[in-house]
Regions:
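Acidic/polar alpha-helix N-cap and adjacent early helical turns
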Residues: 295-306
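Alpha-helix capping/helix-boundary segments
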Residues: 24, 45-47, 76, 157
Length: 306
């Protein structure tokens, strides 16, 4: 859906659209160089592959034409943004938060990418955002301790789901609608997405957001990609687990990962177990299929929190 919107806008303004039949990181750079491509959009997984190419490969291609890179589909970690601005014009990076149902809701401008790590920006023009706590009250405070579910009022929002009015209405509060993301605001009005409500880990009564742990672990040079989720624990209900893709040439161990996590995270957020894989399951657009990683651990259980 997002691809259609971006390409449609490009055609409307008379731009040339360049389409890869199948993603290949070096070929993507070749196309940018050949056609002097000036704007694009991407999920983090694809940009991670581009930035991970050897320096001698990247240096073969001119990337200076890129004026707009829209980060979408999933949050880009601060570490990935640092890699991107080292390889591309720093003023080209924009980040948006939104969904199929609600459209584009926030925008983080290039000048704020390094200044506001973890933020997805401020409400886009014509967008109203309300945060609602677990008791149904509007959240008015700022900072990580004042988080709530994100509800959006937008003229581009769906009227309903196809043949599922009840499902859509259950995610609505009047003219405001949600897709289940949890966030907080800072004192300048910037929004920070904590995680999807369904990905929340509840361990010993503590709420843990996997996205925070993933962002911290991605700072380790030996970690190429990582997914964090909850697995069953008789004692705690759930505990934190990390599935890691090592960087090329890395021999990183689980013990080294947990030691690194202890330096950057509160003790209850440190992964209690780690495993390794060659590749994380993702959709064609690069979205992580975390449910596929979780499923084997929760097979035969009726709930994900004991």
């Amino acid at each position: 859906e997002q691809a259609s919107a971006f390409m449609g806008a490009g055609l409307l303004y008379g731009q040339t659209i360049i389409v890869q039949r199948e993603f290949d990181a070096e070929d993507w750079l070749r196309l940018v160089d050949k056609y002097e491509a000036s704007s694009t959009f991407s999920a983090p997984a694809l940009v991670r592959m581009i930035c991970a190419l050897p320096e001698e490969v990247k240096e073969r291609y001119d990337r200076s034409s890129m004026r707009v890179m829209v980060a979408n589909a999933a949050p880009w970690s601060y570490a990935l943004k640092q890699r991107y601005v080292a390889d591309f014009p720093p003023g080209s990076l924009f980040e948006v938060y939104g969904s199929t149902e609600l459209g584009v809701d926030t925008v983080l401008m290039p000048e704020d990418q390094m200044r506001k790590p973890g933020s997805c920006g401020k409400p886009a023009p014509g967008i109203e955002i309300m945060l609602v706590d677990d008791d149904g009250n509007e959240v008015t405070g700022t900072g990580p301790d004042h988080h709530g579910e994100v509800f959006v009022r937008s003229n581009s929002a769906f009227d309903t789901y196809y043949k599922n009015d009840v499902g859509y209405e259950s995610n609505s509060r009047g003219d405001f609608h949600t897709v289940g993301d949890i966030a907080y605001r800072d004192d300048e009005g910037y929004l920070y997405i904590c995680d999807r409500k369904t990905d929340l880990i509840i361990s010993g009564g503590m709420n843990i957001y996997p996205a925070e742990i993933e962002a911290a672990l991605e700072q380790h040079p030996g970690i190429y990609d990582v997914a964090v989720f909850g697995i069953p624990s008789e004692q705690w209900g759930e505990v934190v687990h990390a599935t890691v893709v090592r960087s090329p040439g890395s021999s990183l161990t689980g013990g080294e990962i947990t030691a690194f996590a202890r330096e950057h995270l509160a003790s209850y957020k440190v992964p209690r177990s780690v495993d390794f894989t060659d590749e994380l399951p993702r959709t064609g657009s690069g979205k992580l299929l975390k449910r596929q990683l979780r499923a084997p651990y929760w097979a035969g259980r009726t709930a994900q929190v004991g």
